[in-house]
Amino acid sequence: MDDFISISLLSLAMLVGCYVAGIIPLAVNFSEDRLKLVTVLGAGLLCGTALAVIVPEGVHALYEDILEDPEAARSSNSKITTTLGLVVHAAADGVALGAAASTSQTSVQLIVFVAIMLHKAPAAFGLVSFLMHAGLERNRIRKHLLVFALAAPVMSMVTYLGLSKSSKEALSEVNATGVAMLFSAGTFLYVATVHVLPEVGGIGHSHKLDATGGRGLSRLEVAALVLGCLIPLILSVGHQH
């Protein structure tokens, strides 16, 4: 019962924190140039959180002494949407938290929760800013944000409640928490580099130049991208395993 209350509170905190972070870009009126700058910053946050927060946490959960090189998985289908990619990522986060809760170790639960929250907020911010840049209606953006915010809490509860004792032991043996977090890091990098950056840089998935000539990113936008990558690194300084 204590574990159930714990996972319920953590899931609720994830839902509220993620939705509030995503609402921020909607609450401010941006000009077209400023919106593009914010979108680039969001892409930087996605890359930074994947490389500085999620990957280290996932690797640490898998290995303590020896690091092995995992095989890189390639997808032949590039038609996946940004929202779907991040929802899949959020679902993986939920599995990670649900698996951590099943261990009945409070310290493990808190470490995974902190790691997830460090990148859930930037992910929500990046998703909403990209959808705004793409010209989606605000009501539809809120629906996309709600689906994204619900994915991790729902999956964490489903994972926790749906596992039998033997299944929990099996997940512990294969380090399900670490695997799920590394999978979510991959979806972050995919969305940021395949969807967001090509879109704001003026080059779509067809790799043809748009009306702006496909000029790429300006110096200010590159600076925003770098800043977005550095913010998660700075926030994670001092976070000990």
UniProtKB/Swiss-Prot annotation:
Glycans are attached at residues 29, 175. Keywords: Cell membrane, Cytoplasm, Glycoprotein, Golgi apparatus, Ion transport, Membrane, Mitochondrion, Nucleus, Transmembrane, Transmembrane helix, Transport, Zinc, Zinc transport. It comes from the Eukaryota. It is found in: Golgi apparatus, trans-Golgi network membrane; Cell membrane; Cytoplasm, Perinuclear region; Mitochondrion. The keyword Cell wall biogenesis/degradation does not apply. The keyword Aminoacyl-tRNA synthetase does not apply. The chain crosses the membrane at residues 4-24, 35-55, 80-100, 110-130, 144-164, 178-198, 220-240. Its main location: Golgi. It holds the Pfam family Zip. GO terms for biological process: bicellular tight junction assembly; intracellular zinc ion homeostasis; regulation of cellular response to testosterone stimulus; regulation of vascular endothelial cell proliferation; zinc ion transmembrane transport. GO terms for molecular function: androgen binding; G protein-coupled receptor activity; zinc efflux transmembrane transporter activity; zinc ion transmembrane transporter activity. Disulfide bonds: none annotated. One of its GO terms (cellular component) is trans-Golgi network. It is a multi-pass membrane protein. It catalyses: Zn(2+)(in) = Zn(2+)(out). InterPro entries: ZIP, ZIP9. Transports zinc ions across cell and organelle membranes into the cytoplasm and regulates intracellular zinc homeostasis. Participates in the zinc ions efflux out of the secretory compartments. Regulates intracellular zinc level, resulting in the enhancement of AKT1 and MAPK3/MAPK1 (Erk1/2) phosphorylation in response to the BCR activation. Also functions as a membrane androgen receptor that mediates, through a G protein, the non-classical androgen signaling pathway, characterized by the activation of MAPK3/MAPK1 (Erk1/2) and transcription factors CREB1 or ATF1. Belongs to the ZIP transporter (TC 2.A.5) family. This is Zinc transporter ZIP9. It comes from Pongo abelii (Sumatran orangutan).
